[in-house]
Amino acid sequence: MPEMEINIMKVLIFTTRQLCYNSGYYFAHRIGEEIEKLGIECEYCEIPENAIPSAGIQIAQPAIENAGKSVDEEAEKMLESYIGKEYLAILDFNSKLPRLILDDESYYLDSIDAPFYNFILDHPLYHHSTLDCKLKNYYAFSIDENHCKYIQNFYPHIKAVYQVALGAENVISLENLQEKKKSILIMGTYRNPDIYMKQILSLIHI
C-alpha cells in the first residue's frame, strides 16, 4: 500500500457536474475563496461533464446498479492521482463520485482519507443512486429543511446533514407589486414530478 500523503490543511474541491447555467465551477471557486480566508488551502479538480456517466435513467434506482459505470480514461487518471492522499475534507455538488467503485469493489472515495461532503441542490430523491452509497465518512448539505430530514430518514449511514441557507441580494421592495404588467415565472429547470411519485411512495414503506 502506498505511503499516505498528508494534506491535512487542504480541502479538495471536485466539480463532477456543471449544473444549471454552468454554475458548478462558480460554486466551487466561491466556496473555495471563503475557505481560503480561514487559512486553509484549496485544491480543485474539474472532471469533464460526461467523463463520469450519470445513473442513466430518470427513476431512482439502487446505487449498486449504478456503481460499475465506466469512466473516461483521462478522468480515471485524474481520479487515481488522489488515491492514498489525506485531506481536511472533500467537497462536490450533486456529486457522481460516491458511485465510483475500484477494482477491489471498495468505494473510490474511501480510498482518500477525508470526510466527503455532498452538496445536494435538488430534492434528494433525484440523487438516490449516490446518497444510497455506504461510504465510510459521508456528509451532506442541503438547501431545504425538509430535504435534510428526508436524507436523515432514508440514508442513516450519512453521518450528518446540514442546511445551507440560499444566498440572496438585498431585499427588493414589494410596494409596487400591483403595478406589475406581466406575471411570468421562468423555470430554470423542470422535471415532471409524476415520474418520481412511484419511487416516493415505495420509499415511504421502507
Each language-model region and where it sits:
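Donor nucleotide-sugar binding/catalytic pocket of nucleotide-sugar-dependent glycosyltransferases
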Residues: 139-148, 157-172, 181-192
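Short, Lys/Arg-enriched N-terminal segments with co-localized hydrophobic residues
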Residues: 1-8
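Conserved small/polar residues in nucleotide/adenosyl-binding loops
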Residues: 204-206
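Short hydrophobic beta-strand segments
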Residues: 9-22, 183-194
